């Protein structure tokens, strides 16, 4: 027993000697700041692991308190966070990270081995009291520069003191400044400071939308690829966010890196670190060009963007041959051609580049010479690189060389489309014949988009398409790829439709669509807002001009040379907080229209959903269509089916109008809404959906909140889109009324989808599509919507944009169904937005708020006038000519738009025709009675455009009234 105790004592003594020796060595080789970064308890807990380290051994890992620690040895030519060992930390949602490397070799491990200690904070640390009061921080700022920066006092209570106890006041102040710079943006701020003898300090501030920890590991990997040596690094959650809906005050992560490197590489390294914040690091471009060939990730983004763009076009040439994966593969197989293409692009748009433009001919010859021995493959490769060259030639301006950004934006000449038409005639058939006035293209990690407009001054909504968020991981990619193949056609067709419906206002038509691939984390709103903020900032940089017509950002070379004024409206997945944010950013940037860059602002605009302006117009066309069907909705029995749910803007507000009561009674007493089909649920009731129950949901809840106990008719049912689980079984819930009782059923996914889709086919007098994806009714399925056994309708009023394809419209009208096209039926939303923007330009914000109660009813009067005037013209003309209603909508739009162009050209030569009286006729009455002097606030381009569209409408509607109007005009003479 005594011998065993003696042996144990010897072991303990030997261990104590080892630990003490290790501690002394640690003191000798680690920088002093190491002992500030880690507590005494943490350092003591490290020592046993440090004694076990071996050269070329695997990293040792342990958990100490709330942190994960890793210890390993690095040879002089090794790297931190090495290889696959560090890869797993990219997915670890840590709130703090520290890397420390010894200044000298760690002697216990042998010669040439440096000790690396890493720690990752993975659970919240105990709250700590602030190290400095705000008064102390403010005094530092005052002593240094006169005053504390704006926003510092608001930021102070959000500082994450648990992570900041080691900072001195000067370091804290520096980080506060950088945090204030970027907490409302989707980009990183980077500062590199020389410390002498090729030593540098880099500070990085980055909004942590949902993946800040992975940004840290990407930066560390870029150090390795650049052959820079990290001595120590820190990553911490510097400040907490306000609620995630607050887009101006995000959580900000902060990184500090102390390293050695070559001074001449610093500018490129800074570009790379900034780009990595919003750049993919898991794709073929990163692996082949950044990792393998050491290309700067900022430069590689040009090729990524180009690949995304040409894929969006080749989708209408041959989707199978030109799938995205093959496009990317063929591009990276020819890095020399990629380098020449990038050089050509630089020669045109890099403001720091001197010398002549690079010629295209050598590049064209190199592309033509591609020859792998496989003819079909080579033909694809040549077309891909010719398409990339076409993309480059089409660029008129870009923010690519802007220092601080979170996305790329390109203004393109729409003539690029000719290239694809020459490859295949099928391409041209995919789009309306009219070609756009201008196209913008946007790109960043997991997001791409277009803005298409058909006139110089144009407006239209910004839609973000987020394919099937809640689906299985194995299917989510399929839905994304399907949307990816179609989204250029979607934005094109919607913009073209918008141009048709904008005939009553001075702006032509446009549309903006962003396609977003979500990470599947569940917090898709944060991903949505991060992408929208980045794309908006990139877009704004290309349309933000000084008073003299020069772009404000001097790093953008403008080969177009024309001031562009663009307006945006809200659309799918555009929430009030983002609308308000964009308005504020428009003011901060000094944009021509200020907050008028977007309409529908809840605090200083005419919010479409609040006032139901789009649905107001749809309802006017509904009433006129019912008259044509010889149905008096105020007394006759009739049935309705609707796509879109009670919480949606158009569907919800239309339900509000259809379900309204006067003196306690329904205005349409015998109306039956037999079917409603919405994303969260589908509802059918042959006796008519319970109107009181449906009314409870309108503009408050989605359709899945409908109480199944309120089902009425035999066979009535509701199905729910959210899948249910019991063990390994997944099913969909149905409640159906059978023999007077509600019965629960479990449906397979296929049965659910069959019922969901067929709910749109139910028999009703009138179909009101007010929500759903474009091309839902198409040439392949139109017969299911035509009249037949238990299905169909007598008329359609299109509240949703492009819900029917042109071919489907023709076939349905041939079958005898009346169809009021979207460009007529839902135009009142955009008319409202136009008046909102004009009112915002002419009134101060407080005036707008105070006059809103008067202004909105006057706008509604304008909406009623425009909707009724067109509806009467459509049905009157149809009764005479027999033309389809949709063709008449197109004819009217083309006539007014063509006349508008002619008048605009005339007004260029005769500006005296643009009178105040003409402008006031177009505007709500309050501007004639109270604010006539504000007309001078309108940009000259707007004055001419307003006069032009006002005259065009008068001329076309008057001339379209035929012989009766001609006689009336003759009698006046």
Label the model's feature ranges.
Residues 2-437, 442-451, 464-484, 527, ...:
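Non-catalytic interaction/regulatory segments
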Residues 138, 142, 147, 157, ...:
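Low-complexity, serine/threonine/proline-enriched polar segments
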Residues 198, 460-474, 593-607, 727-740, ...:
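Gly-rich Lys/Arg/Thr-decorated short loops/hinges at beta-loop-alpha junctions or inter-strand turns
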Residues 283, 491-638, 665, 677:
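Glycine/serine-rich phosphate-binding loop and adjoining beta1-alpha1 elements at the start
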Residues 298-302, 412-416, 434-462, 500-524, ...:
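Conserved phosphate/anionic-ligand binding catalytic regions in large, soluble enzymes, centered on
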Residues 331-383, 390, 610-643, 647-725, ...:
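Extended, regular secondary-structure scaffolds
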Residues 475-482, 501, 505, 522-530, ...:
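Alpha-helix capping and helix-loop boundary segments enriched in small/acidic/polar residues
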Residues 493, 623-641, 663-671, 685-699, ...:
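Non-transmembrane, aqueous-exposed alpha-helical and coiled segments at domain scale
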């Amino acid at each position: 027993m005594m011998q065993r105790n003696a042996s144990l004592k010897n072991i303990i003594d030997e261990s104590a000697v080892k630990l003490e020796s290790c501690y002394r060595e640690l003191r000798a080789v680690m920088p002093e700041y190491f002992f500030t970064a880690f507590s005494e308890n943490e350092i003591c807990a490290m020592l046993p692991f440090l004694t076990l380290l071996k050269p070329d051994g695997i990293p040792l890992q342990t958990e100490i308190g709330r942190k994960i620690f890793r210890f390993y040895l690095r040879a002089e030519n090794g790297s931190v966070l090495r290889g696959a060992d560090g890869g797993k930390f990219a997915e670890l949602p840590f709130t703090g990270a520290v890397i420390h490397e010894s200044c000298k070799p760690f002697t216990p491990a042998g010669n040439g081995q440096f000790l690396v200690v890493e720690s990752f904070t993975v659970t919240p640390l105990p709250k700590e009291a602030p190290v400095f009061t705000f008064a102390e921080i403010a005094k530092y700022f005052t002593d240094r520069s006169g005053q504390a920066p704006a926003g510092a006092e608001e930021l102070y209570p959000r500082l994450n003191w648990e992570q900041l106890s080691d900072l001195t006041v000067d370091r804290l102040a520096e980080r506060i400044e950088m945090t204030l710079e970027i907490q409302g943006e989707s980009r990183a701020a980077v500062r590199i400071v020389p410390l002498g003898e090729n030593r540098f300090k880099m500070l990085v501030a980055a909004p942590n939308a949902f993946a800040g920890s992975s940004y840290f590991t990407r930066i560390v990997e870029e150090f390795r690829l650049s052959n820079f040596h990290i001595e120590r690094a820190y990553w911490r959650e510097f400040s907490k966010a306000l609620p995630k809906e607050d887009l101006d005050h995000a959580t900000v992560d902060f990184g500090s890196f102390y390293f050695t490197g070559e001074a001449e590489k610093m500018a490129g390294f800074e570009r790379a670190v900034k780009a990595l914040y919003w750049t993919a690091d898991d794709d073929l471009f990163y692996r082949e060009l950044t990792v393998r060939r050491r290309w700067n990730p900022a430069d590689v983004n040009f090729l990524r963007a180009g690949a995304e763009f040409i894929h969006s076009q080749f989708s209408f040439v041959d989707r199978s041959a030109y799938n995205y994966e093959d496009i990317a593969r063929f591009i990276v197989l020819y890095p020399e051609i990629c380098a020449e293409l990038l050089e050509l692009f630089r020669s045109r748009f890099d403001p720091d580049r001197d010398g002549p433009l690079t010629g295209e001919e050598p590049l064209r010859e190199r592309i033509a010479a591609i020859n792998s021995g496989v003819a079909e493959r080579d033909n694809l490769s040549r077309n891909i690189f010719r398409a990339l060259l076409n993309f480059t030639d089409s660029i008129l301006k870009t923010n690519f060389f802007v220092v601080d950004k979170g996305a790329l934006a390109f203004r393109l000449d729409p003539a690029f489309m000719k290239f694809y038409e020459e490859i295949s005639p099928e391409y041209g058939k995919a789009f309306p014949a009219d070609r756009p006035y201008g196209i913008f293209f946007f790109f960043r990690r997991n997001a791409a988009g277009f803005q298409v407009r058909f006139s110089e001054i144009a407006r239209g909504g910004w839609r973000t398409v987020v394919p099937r968020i809640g689906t299985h991981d194995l299917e989510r990619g399929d839905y994304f790829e399907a949307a990816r193949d179609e989204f250029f056609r979607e934005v094109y067709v919607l913009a073209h439709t918008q141009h048709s419906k904008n005939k009553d206002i001075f702006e032509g038509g446009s549309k903006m669509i962003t396609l977003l691939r979500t990470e599947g984390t569940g917090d898709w709103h944060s991903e949505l807002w991060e992408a929208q903020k980045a794309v908006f900032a990139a877009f704004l940089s290309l349309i933000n001009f000084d008073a003299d017509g020069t772009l404000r950002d001097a790093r953008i070379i403008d080969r177009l040379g024309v001031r562009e004024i663009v307006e945006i409206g809200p659309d799918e997945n555009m929430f009030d907080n983002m609308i308000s944010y964009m308005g504020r950013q428009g003011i901060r940037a000094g944009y021509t229209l200020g907050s008028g860059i977007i309409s529908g602002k809840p605090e200083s605009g005419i919010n479409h959903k609040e006032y139901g302006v789009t649905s107001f117009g749809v309802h006017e066309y509904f009433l006129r269509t019912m008259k044509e069907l010889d149905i008096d909705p105020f007394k006759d029995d009739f049935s309705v089916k609707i796509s879109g749910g009670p919480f949606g803007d158009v569907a919800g507000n239309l339900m509000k109008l259809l379900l309204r009561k006067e003196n306690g009674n329904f205005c349409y007493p015998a109306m039956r809404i037999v079917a409603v089909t919405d994303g969260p649920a589908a509802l059918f009731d042959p006796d008519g959906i319970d109107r009181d129950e449906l009314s409870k949901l309108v503009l408050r809840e989605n359709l899945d909140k409908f109480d199944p106990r309120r089902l009425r008719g035999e066979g009535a049912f509701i199905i729910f889109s959210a899948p249910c689980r019991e063990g390994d079984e997944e099913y969909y819930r149905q409640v159906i009324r059978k023999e007077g009782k509600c019965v629960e059923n479990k449906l397979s996914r296929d049965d659910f989808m069959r019922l969901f889709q067929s709910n749109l086919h139910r028999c009703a007098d009138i179909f009101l599509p007010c929500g759903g994806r474009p091309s839902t009714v198409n040439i392949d399925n139109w017969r299911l919507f035509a009249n037949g056994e238990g299905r169909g309708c007598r008329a359609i009023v299109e509240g949703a944009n492009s819900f029917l394809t042109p071919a489907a419209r023709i076939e349905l009208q041939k079958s005898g169904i009346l169809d009021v096209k979207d460009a007529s039926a839902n135009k009142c939303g955009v008319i409202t937005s136009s008046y909102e923007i004009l009112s915002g330009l002419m009134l101060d914000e407080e005036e707008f708020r105070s006059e809103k109660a008067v202004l909105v009813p006057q706008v509604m009067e304008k909406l009623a006038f425009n909707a009724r005037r067109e509806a009467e013209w459509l049905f009157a003309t149809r009764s005479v000519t027999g033309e389809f209603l949709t063709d008449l909508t197109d004819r009217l739009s083309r006539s007014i738009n063509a006349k508008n162009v002619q008048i605009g050209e005339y007004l260029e030569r005769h500006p005296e025709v643009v009178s105040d009286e003409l402008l006031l006729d177009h505007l709500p009455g309050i501007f004639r009675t109270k604010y006539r002097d504000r007309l001078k606030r309108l940009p000259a381009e707007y004055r001419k455009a307003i006069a032009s569209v006002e005259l065009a409408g008068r001329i076309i509607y008057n001339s379209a009234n035929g012989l009766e109007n001609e006689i009336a005009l003759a009698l006046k003479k």
